[in-house]
Amino acid sequence: MSHLTPQEARLILATHLPQPPTDLPTVTLLDLTDADPIACATFHPYLVHCAPHTTTYLVTLQFSMPPKGDAPLTAPNSIEAQYKLLSALHTHLSSGPPPIPLPFPIPIALNADAPRPYILARLPALLPPSAQLKQLSAVRGALPPEQAASLDLRFGVALRAQHNLQSEWCGPPPLESEGLYSWQETFTRLVDEALCAAEAADIASAEDVTALQGYLARAIGAFLFDDVEVPSLVALTTGAGSVFVTDTDGEPQLALLLPSFAHLLYGDPLLERAFSPSEVPSKALLEGYGAPPPIVFARQRTKRMWYDLYLGLVMLLGAGRVGGDQDVDWAAQLVERSRVLLRDAPCY
């Protein structure tokens, strides 16, 4: 597997830009940790810096077709679906001035017919080649509280802006043609498929899956997931690891929010990983997100347990498809903790 070369990057820019740079650009792989192993194996994001340094581009390169396995709805979105959703998000954000500059990539072009299909986008602000992007999850602990709070606040504002993009149908792109309008029906289908695939892959025992399906029936009977009137654009895996900061001005700035396009879907905003107790969402993040907060009642905490279970299963199933030594201990712990908590979790 060869990475994107400066020569390839220059050709991509020359294909899609009216005035492409003539000098060879600088290309750096955007390092993602604690992310979906199958998405990381299938798609690689690269930062492309041009001289003179007026714009920084983001090229998402597809290395292989995502294997679907026994749970096709948990597989990464196609690159065409990713571009369609990213474009819809950009159109939505452009429809009105945001309260603060939002760090989402701005789509430029899709080439699904290239030997290695790609999405070309640009960063909303200039990023010098010397700037180092670091994940918020990696640097937050070393920041002064006021700086960490400022970054979390902006993260919350950006999440709310993303979730304000809504749809008439629920689920990932493969379900669009079915026009499902009930989030409860949609999520039940997603999690049941994941549970059955986890049992087949020896990720979960038959006994545990049967018990969880019983808990799910109880939740459905209590209409636990039926409070989502209009589904929002959520990315499932977006947390502090999706937020990239830089300190080019001497103070950490939120430079890029890269939601996992591979798992974008329309559903419950609470599905976003940023709201998982395992992420320890800060007061500043929730303040930036605004009202209504994602969790108010006990039943919403139970919903988040189900979403943690689903997140963990999707990651473990993805790791199984990729093979090799994948760091998914956190996902296994998430599944086990959710399994235990859901046994007695209230649905009312």
Regions found by a protein language model. Give the residues of each.
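Membrane-proximal envelope and lipid/glycan-remodeling enzymes
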Residues: 2-3, 32, 48, 61-72, ...
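Intrinsically disordered, low-complexity segments that are common in secreted/host-exposed effector
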Residues: 51-56, 83, 119, 166-189, ...
